[in-house]
Amino acid sequence: MEEIKLTEYSHGAGCGCKISPMLLDEILKTDISSTLYPQLLVGNEHKDDAAAYDLGNGTSVLSTTDFFMPIVDDAFTFGRIAATNALSDIYAMGGKPLMAISIFGWPIEKLSSEVARQVIDGGRAACEDAGIPLAGGHSIDSPEPIFGLAVTGIVDNKNLMKNSSATDDCYIFITKSIGIGILTTAQKQKKIEDGDIDVAIEAMATLNRAGAIFATLDSVLTMTDVTGFGLLGHLSEVCEASGISANIWFEKVPLLQNVEKYRAQGCIPGGSRKNFMSYGHKISQISDRQREILCDAQTSGGLLVFVKKSGLDEFYKSAKEFGLNLEPIGETTPRRKHVIEVL
């Protein structure tokens, strides 16, 4: 049986398929105010990870969706990564997922139903890992494979993590190493070594379930997950929503193994340039190396966690319970000319 390589059937990969931040802002521009719906605690005003609707009993229902084209060749692994990525938005908001339904597009004239089933099975495995059902979905015949989830979650209102909740006295942490876009581009260019792509896959298939616990800590003010807009893009969203700036200590940012090697070989995804064109004017002057790493599109990336400097002990203790030995990669500051300074 011929080996199927799903990445050969798509023009983009993972969260690198995202529309650029600048173009997305233009598309979503509207004069309609969310104040028409007072129960909607979180909408699209501050580019949060999920919508939150107040149920009136101290809790809110969370709703989010995420889907993309294959970032790996194996069908089951693609489904698992896509589902893990979609679930991340619920954890980033401080919530717990309740159930999911699938979003599925398949080129039925090109790829078999057996391969399609493997994608769904991978998505179901991620949902089972999160303790929720994959309860249904919708499918279409599409030119390229597409898979993802719409996820419903729940959160205590006091634990709701909003982009606008950070202050200027936080340390910034990231829970996964970055470089997914560079490594998967190396895979597409057939330069990747098996061990390196395996490490990337393991990272992408790991749930950000720690977010639901971090949100209960008084010292954690907010979180967001790092996905298609890169570390700088998602950090800038929090800073702008909160009216603050941030310093990133570049050499403290953790990288997946051999990211620097593949970057030097020119394995730079096109989305990195699009990302920087959208928000580069908000960033201090940076080197090509810094730009190519910090704007690299992540798929199922880690959580950016904003922790009050006075409350690190409880955060470190909680992180270690999830096997996370974290160090700050930066800090927030009062608002300055540049939203982010890379040091």
UniProtKB/Swiss-Prot annotation:
CDD domains: SelD
Cofactor binding notes: Binds 1 Mg(2+) ion per monomer.
EC id: 2.7.9.3
GO MF: ATP binding; magnesium ion binding; selenide, water dikinase activity
Gene name for this UniProt entry: selD
Binding site for ATP: 18, 46-48, 66, 89, 137-139
Any one GO BP annotation for this protein: selenocysteine biosynthetic process
InterPro entries in the cross-refs: PurM-like_C_dom, PurM-like_C_sf, PurM-like_N, PurM-like_N_sf, SelD_I, SPS/SelD
Residues where Mg(2+) binds: 49, 89, 225
Record's subunit section: Homodimer.
GO cellular component, one term: cytoplasm
Cofactor: Mg(2+)
Protein name, entry field: Selenide, water dikinase
Active site per UniProt: 15
Family statement: Belongs to the selenophosphate synthase 1 family. Class I subfamily.
Reaction equations catalysed: hydrogenselenide + ATP + H2O = selenophosphate + AMP + phosphate + 2 H(+)
Swiss-Prot/TrEMBL keywords: ATP-binding, Kinase, Magnesium, Metal-binding, Nucleotide-binding, Selenium, Transferase
Feature type site, description Important for catalytic activity: 18
UniProt source species: Sulfurimonas denitrificans (strain ATCC 33889 / DSM 1251) (Thiomicrospira denitrificans (strain ATCC 33889 / DSM 1251))
Free-text function comment from the UniProt entry: Synthesizes selenophosphate from selenide and ATP.
